[in-house]
Swiss-Prot record:
Domain of life, per lineage: Bacteria
Pathway membership: Cofactor biosynthesis; molybdopterin biosynthesis
Keyword Repressor carried by entry: no
The encoding gene: moaE
Coiled-coil annotated spans: none
Protein residues bound to substrate: 37-39, 103-104, 119, 126-128
Single GO molecular function: molybdopterin synthase activity
Organism: Haemophilus influenzae (strain ATCC 51907 / DSM 11121 / KW20 / Rd)
Gene Ontology BP annotations: Mo-molybdopterin cofactor biosynthetic process
Upper classification of the organism: Bacteria, Pseudomonadati, Pseudomonadota, Gammaproteobacteria, Pasteurellales
Subunit and interaction comment: Heterotetramer of 2 MoaD subunits and 2 MoaE subunits. Also stable as homodimer. The enzyme changes between these two forms during catalysis.
Record protein name field: Molybdopterin synthase catalytic subunit
Amino acid sequence: MTDIQIAVQEQPFDQNAVYQWLSEQHSIGATVIFVGKVRDLNLGDEVSSLYLEHYPAMTEKALNEIVAQAKVRWDIQRVSVIHRVGLLQTGDEIVLVGVSSAHRGDAYHANEFIMDFLKSKAPFWKKEQTNQGERWIEARESDKEALEKW
């Protein structure tokens, strides 16, 4: 069984199943899971839905490279990255990043690192449906700044 699970999918993910997989080894003392959701407000406008596109194969390659970098920097045992694509509604879960390790510090830092790099380096494109119409979402300056701490 591999220690990395990466999926780009349209269907919802099962947080409980991911947690069970991440934490099933007895050497694991910490499991950190981040779940991102579609917000109902962005840039001052009400958001009703979000459409996510990706570049198949290239996206998975980028996610694998990000996870590989995290595994070099921290002593982590298992990683799960699931990112949804397609049409999502307000409140839907978009992304899950889960990391397990013997110690919480490694799990926390690796999880944040993976999420920060996923936001800026993985080829996903987001189009929001708002009360003002449709718009493509540009990368935020705060996402770029988050990379600088690493």
